[in-house]
Amino acid sequence: ITTHNFFSMFKSLSLKVIIFGFIFTFFSSFGQSFFLGLFNSSIRETLSISHGQFGSIYASATLLSSFILIWIGKKIDDMNISKFAFYVVVLLSISSFLFSKISSIVFLFIAIFLMRLSGQGLMSHAASTTISRYFEKSRGKALSTSWLGLSSAEFVMPLTIVFLLTFI
């Protein structure tokens, strides 16, 4: 794909939908392993749990969130995307707040479950489903462009978090 072809595709595609996809894949990072792993050591230290215990809690919460995603994810087919996206953002906000307040193993499980469901699951799902619903002919281009959001987050978010943690 040439630079000209890449940028010219925006003339035929809805830039708003691609930006929506980019933003949602970017912020899905809050529920992605690379992001949550940044807090692994401090959580284990705070709760006095081992790597294995943390891993078991993480795996169980992730598995449960994937099963729940099947049920919640299909709601996007019957709901206005703006409304669905609003609910997902609210859930991610609540999840992030709860994640910042982890004080027990049970709370850790709930927080990871909600972060994985809302961030990694529903944010990604909303982005991909919206792009797939809106685009027919250039679906692949639109999806690949919107998924640059996650790649960008994988670079930006760890640097940002490590920088912000220096102030604590």
Predicted stretch roles:
Residues 43-44, 75-77, 160-168:
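Interfacial helix-cap and linker-helix signal at transmembrane-aqueous boundaries
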Residues 26, 106-122:
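Hydrophobic core of transmembrane alpha-helices in multi-pass small-molecule transporters
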Residues 67-105:
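Conserved MFS/SLC helix-loop-helix module at the cytosolic interface between two early adjacent transmembrane helices
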Residues 2-24:
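Cytosolic juxtamembrane N-terminal segment immediately preceding the first transmembrane helix
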Residues 16-51, 68-72, 157-158:
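Extracytoplasmic
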Residues 138-159:
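Glycine-rich segments within core transmembrane alpha-helices of 12-TM secondary carriers
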Residues 60-64, 151-152:
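Short hydrophobic/small-residue motifs within alpha-helical transmembrane segments
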